[in-house]
Amino acid sequence: MPSKRGGSGGLDIGLIFAHKILTVLFILSTVGWIVAFIGQCAAEADGVGRQGVLWFAIFLQLFLIIGKYLGVMSDSLGTSRLQLTAFTAVALVFSVFGINSGIYSSNSADEAVAAGWFLITIANVIWLLFLTTEEDSVLYPIVNIANAGITPPAARTSSRYNGAGGAGSGGQSMRMAGSGGVGTGLGGGYGAGNGSAYGGFQGGSGYQPAYGNSPSAADITTANGTGLGAPKISSASIRSRGANDAGATQDAPSVASHGAPASPAQVGSKSTDLPDYGYKARALYAYQANADDPTEISFSKGEVLDIVDNSGKWWQARRSNGETGIVPSNYMQLL
């Protein structure tokens, strides 16, 4: 899988034209920058007026334009969203100063400066809306109305982080429709405040074993190593504080005195049948799984996946190579 969400991890100049609104913004900002720069040079040469701080502004705007070009061509605007937003806001203030410096002047060079900065101001305002609009906003479908392949900057953030920590909803809220999860019987389950309740995949910011023999999230895997379905617990996963802790429930896997793992029959006794993948969905964008979350899977743009259930923000999916895991629903389109 690629290391970036944009596909091959390289630069694709065709992506500049994949989002029609961004294409117009690039034209406005590039033409505006050229006009403003030539106007400032002419104004300085004529000795009509010193441009002063506008020289800083013009080069700040140049670096922003280049950075946005690179971000779009690599489809990585989401990774630099905060930096681009901050510097675009600063550049917007300077662009207004640029308009004010020459709009009332009778000198043609100053008028060119004002005209150039006016085009840049329009581009900066729309860029700020594009970079800061979240998926739940009414502006989101508007700023992405002509998008034919660019990953929206807010897509990854809002699909993975859906609230603060707490009982039942953590920093990484995951929903997996399907069965085969681990119940509350594993060593008494996890703590309510920082818990990670597997089987519904409502994950908290972390977990604390309430009792002695609780396995870690990374140790709960299936035979195919995907982290879904019935648990398979190795001897290294046992956090032992006592052979027969009072908090262990009847559903907890038995552990021998020498730390041997429970038999597959004992561990899988509570598991259910394999989930039915009744839907198919095509990936609208490429996605790289979070390295800290073993339940997520990566996929490429245009890839078709099998889906268990199409409800919720995270879907249980299976790739063509048999790999299973959860995927963000806003990256998928049902077929």
From Swiss-Prot:
Protein source organism: Mycosarcoma maydis (Corn smut fungus)
Positions of transmembrane segments: 21-41, 53-73, 84-104, 112-132
Gene: SHO1
Alphabetical UniProt keywords: Cell membrane, Membrane, SH3 domain, Stress response, Transmembrane, Transmembrane helix
Ranges in the topological domain labelled Extracellular: 42-52, 105-111
Record membrane topology: Multi-pass membrane protein
Localization annotation: Cell membrane
Pfam families found in the cross-reference section: SH3_1 (PF00018)
GO BP field: actin cortical patch assembly; regulation of actin filament polymerization
General function of this protein: Plasma membrane osmosensor that activates the high osmolarity glycerol (HOG) MAPK signaling pathway in response to high osmolarity.
CDD domains assigned to the protein according to its UniProt record, in alphabetical order: SH3_Sho1p
Annotated stretches, region: Disordered: 238-272
Coiled coil spans: none
Intervals, Cytoplasmic compartment: 1-20, 74-83, 133-335
Residues of the SH3 domain: 276-335
Recorded family membership: Belongs to the SHO1 family.
InterPro entries: SH3-like_dom_sf, SH3_domain, Sho1_SH3
Record has Transmembrane helix as a keyword: yes
GO CC terms, sorted: nucleus; plasma membrane
Oligomer status and interactors: Forms homooligomers.
Protein name per its UniProtKB record: High osmolarity signaling protein SHO1
PANTHER family: ACTIN CYTOSKELETON-REGULATORY COMPLEX PROTEIN SLA1 (PTHR15735:SF19), FCH AND DOUBLE SH3 DOMAINS PROTEIN (PTHR15735)
Protein's UniProt keywords contain Cell membrane: yes
